[in-house]
Regions:
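Membrane-embedded alpha-helical signal segments
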Residues: 1-223
Length: 223
């Protein structure tokens, strides 16, 4: 399953693919899911812990527990993963597990930009929650998420997000090269990073936009 997913899915930092081998029985389990979309506590409680303890035949658990559904069509794998399902392969059979984690309850309203129409919620300071929001707003297997760190001391984490099918390769390379050329010790805000990427104090036409609106991010990805 994991080898096939590497072919049909775009590479993404948030796509977790694990092969787990039981230390006593030697049985193997393959597991795949998008980290921002799922509740890892559910993964541990329903999959990894029962498999490792082996107190009950794991195949019996997969077949008897209503949280697991047998998947017979590989064409549905991508959609299931993008909808917050975890995929499990055990003894040459594929099962899906609903581990969806998706909530807007802790989000604040957008401050940088207001909108009369569309969602009023902004991104979260927690990058995993923000990636959850973006993946739910832009449900596509072509969405690529790359992680980088900037700042020699701060090692500030950032994510480059783009649609592999629609992205302008030249622009993507330009952004990657500019990010790689940032050599400050501390990067503490998006505004500071924007000034470093622009390279100029004043520009006749803007080339970068800072936004926290979900609808604008989805629209930008779709171009």
């Amino acid at each position: 399953m994991l080898d096939r997913l590497k072919i049909i899915l775009s590479p993404a930092e948030d796509l977790i693919q694990n092969e787990i081998q039981h230390p006593i029985t030697g049985q193997k389990l393959e597991l795949a899911y998008f980290l921002p979309l799922i509740d890892e506590q559910k993964i541990h409680a329903f999959i990894t812990v029962p498999f490792s303890k082996n107190e009950y035949p794991f195949m019996n658990l997969l077949k008897s527990n209503p949280n697991f559904t047998k998947v017979t069509d590989p064409a549905t794998w991508t959609d299931l993963l993008l909808r917050g399902q975890a995929l499990i392969e055990f003894q040459d059979q594929i099962f899906s597990f609903d581990a969806m984690k998706f909530s807007y309850t802790d989000l604040s309203e957008a401050n940088l930009e207001t909108s009369i129409l569309g969602p009023q919620n902004s991104l979260s300071e927690d990058p995993i929650i923000s990636l959850n929001i973006i993946r739910n707003a832009y449900v596509s297997p072509e969405l690529v998420i790359d992680k980088m760190n900037v700042g020699n001391l701060s090692r500030t984490g950032l994510y480059i997000i783009y649609d592999q099918r629609k992205v302008n390769k030249h622009t993507l390379d330009l952004v990657m090269n500019k990010l790689a050329s940032v050599h400050l010790d501390l990067i503490q805000s998006t505004g500071q990073l924007e000034r470093l990427l622009n390279g100029k104090k004043y520009q006749l036409f803007p080339t970068l936009l800072i936004t926290e609106r979900i609808d604008r991010i989805g629209r930008a990805l779709s171009f």
